[in-house]
Amino acid sequence: MNVAILLAAGKGERMSENVPKQFLEIEGRMLFEYPLSTFLKSEAIDGVVIVTRREWFEVVEKRVFHEKVLGIVEGGDTRSQSVRSALEFLEKFSPSYVLVHDSARPFLRKKHVSEVLRRARETGAATLALKNSDALVRVENDRIEYIPRKGVYRILTPQAFSYEILKKAHENGGEWADDTEPVQKLGVKIALVEGDPLCFKVTFKEDLELARIIAREWERIP
């Protein structure tokens, strides 16, 4: 059984909106509904768990009607806490693999879901990633230090893992920017799957405007 964990518990404070960004509506759908739709259509996914804050349960319940949705789980104050809540909920389902995705990355393709899961079956863990094409610098005390671009990737989601591996990685708590970090500390090789620029994370208002433009054509994008 392959289960997608859709993280939608963030507060979206950098967006400066009245509601968390995952619940902002673009082209008739809330942001979280775009990746959710991809998971529901994907033949590689058997079930979906949506993690959100308690005060948004009713909103999510009204928007979600599908047999693949296994449940809505209350998220924590941090990303890692939300992942652990989902893993605990999933114990009764005994999934083989779980796929973790940020709902603030609305434009998820089915081919990426399938490929990340395929690579995770080979190594135990895989993540979507994108080669960096920009100049990178580190700034300290007003001094700029250039970082070589070769071998530098942006880590994206979705990320897929053996359920048992991810559960073990989180069993001692800890706070992580994403889930590949604690998994790698177990000695598990992380497979990288090439993503594309459409996998961007909606963080600022400018990102939301770009998302609106893409959303108008999303159903036509293969």
Swiss-Prot record:
Feature type site, description Positions MEP for the nucleophilic attack: R149, K201
GO MF term set: 2-C-methyl-D-erythritol 4-phosphate cytidylyltransferase activity; cytidylyltransferase activity
UniProt catalytic activity: 2-C-methyl-D-erythritol 4-phosphate + CTP + H(+) = 4-CDP-2-C-methyl-D-erythritol + diphosphate
KW DNA-binding (keyword) present: no
InterPro entries on file: IspD, IspD/TarI, ISPD_synthase_CS, Nucleotide-diphossugar_trans
Family matches, as Pfam families: IspD
Pathway assigned in UniProt: Isoprenoid biosynthesis; isopentenyl diphosphate biosynthesis via DXP pathway; isopentenyl diphosphate from 1-deoxy-D-xylulose 5-phosphate: step 2/6
Site, as annotated: Transition state stabilizer: R14, K21
GO cellular component entries: cytosol
Record Gene3D superfamilies: Spore Coat Polysaccharide Biosynthesis Protein SpsA, Chain A (3.90.550.10)
Keywords of this entry: Isoprene biosynthesis, Nucleotidyltransferase, Transferase
Class of this enzyme: transferase
GO BP: isopentenyl diphosphate biosynthetic process, methylerythritol 4-phosphate pathway
Superkingdom to which the source organism belongs: Bacteria
EC number, as in UniProt: 2.7.7.60
Family: Belongs to the IspD/TarI cytidylyltransferase family. IspD subfamily.
Record's function text: Catalyzes the formation of 4-diphosphocytidyl-2-C-methyl-D-erythritol from CTP and 2-C-methyl-D-erythritol 4-phosphate (MEP).
Protein name: 2-C-methyl-D-erythritol 4-phosphate cytidylyltransferase
